[in-house]
């Protein structure tokens, strides 16, 4: 018999969507929230912030998704190969007939998985250079403000405050936060960013150094300080930071990124602050050494000065010779002043003797005669001035005549030069060659001037413009008719000068 249902059944058919959503409701109502343990694979961090992954064991696998809003709240970062325990809600994806788990929380399945994840994260941050020694900032030698990020209760904060109070007088700012659990990494990161955001000179003093402290605990207890976001926040800060998380044997990710690592919170307080008593003792010792050094230097300079002064002459000896020269010069000066006064008095008497009325009258007469002579010469020059003006008025006309005469002379000379050049060219022996004639030279090199100079069979040389040719005379020649000389060209007469204007040449 056939197992197929009868075709005449009256049961209403489901649509594909109705069946898919019915299965979805059944699955969600039956299971709700579940906890799964398995290994992560196919982890994909989408650009929109969601994370898609697969949770598998040795026999089966189930798809999972972490929505963007839940990614930051996960206890661990989803990575391929990590064994985890997830909590979420089972649902279906009707468009693909698949079921999946929507993950709300995630935690590592064991210490080994946590340490493996930590090693991968350490390698990643080290490759980015976050652990490089050159990034480490030096701690201030004498901080005025120390910022402490830790739990407000417990022995850690008491040990830090007590140790700082005993060593160094400074202000301590405590930023309280939880140091264990899922919220610890976010609160510690917020505290570090808050301290770095304080501006110098504001109402709240900006710390010179930060201490992140927590007591000892298990790997799970200290896991918040292995958070990647916390490590990057420490690296981005500008205030030097000391990490004091756990005991000396405990190592967290923040220890590699911080500027200094302290084995205990008490040691962190000692790293951050100097000892006031030691500084005072050091300053006192330096002051004593400086005073002794100064006194010794002054004594050495005084001894050297005394030794050098022994070789110097006495001041009176230095001035004795100059004083003697001064006394001699002052004695000579008195006598010289007396002689100078006598000479000038005699000169004054001679000058006053010449200033008589007769001498002044003679000088006046001479000056008057010279003045009269100058007046006569001035009158004569005034009478001749019109003639000089007329002569100067004729100068432009004379210059024009001189210029015209020079132009005519230049033109005549140019015409003569042109005629001479034409004559030179006509007398040039090479000129007939340019007109197609040839020069006939006999065997001895003489020029044949007529046919009678040549005999039959004689070898001659014909010179043309383009070159020479040898030839032999054949036949008897007769006298050539005498050439008629060309009539000479009439010589142009020079143009007559304009009427009323003379020729300077």
UniProtKB/Swiss-Prot annotation:
What InterPro entries does the entry give? Answer: Exonuc_VII_L, Exonuc_VII_lsu_C, OB-fold_nuc-bd_dom
Q: Which GO terms describe its cellular component?
A: cytoplasm; exodeoxyribonuclease VII complex
Q: Does the keyword Disulfide bond apply?
A: no
Name the reaction it catalyses.
Exonucleolytic cleavage in either 5'- to 3'- or 3'- to 5'-direction to yield nucleoside 5'-phosphates
Residue ranges for the region (Disordered) are 466-505
Q: Does the keyword Transport apply?
A: no
Alphabetical keyword list: Cytoplasm, Exonuclease, Hydrolase, Nuclease
EC number(s) per entry? 3.1.11.6
Major localisation: cytoplasm
Q: Where is the composition biased (Pro residues)?
A: 480-497
Its subcellular locations are: Cytoplasm
Q: Could you mention a single GO BP entry for this protein?
A: DNA catabolic process
Segment forming the signal sequence: none
Q: Which residues form a coiled coil?
A: none
Q: Which residues cross the membrane?
A: none
Q: Name one GO molecular function term.
A: exodeoxyribonuclease VII activity
Subunit structure as annotated in this protein's UniProt entry: Heterooligomer composed of large and small subunits.
What family is this? Answer: Belongs to the XseA family.
Give the matching HAMAP family.
Answer: Exonuc_7_L (MF_00378)
- What job does this protein perform? Bidirectionally degrades single-stranded DNA into large acid-insoluble oligonucleotides, which are then degraded further into small acid-soluble oligonucleotides.
Any idea what this protein is called? Exodeoxyribonuclease 7 large subunit
Q: Recite the lineage of the species.
A: Bacteria, Pseudomonadati, Pseudomonadota, Alphaproteobacteria, Caulobacterales
Q: Which gene encodes it?
A: xseA
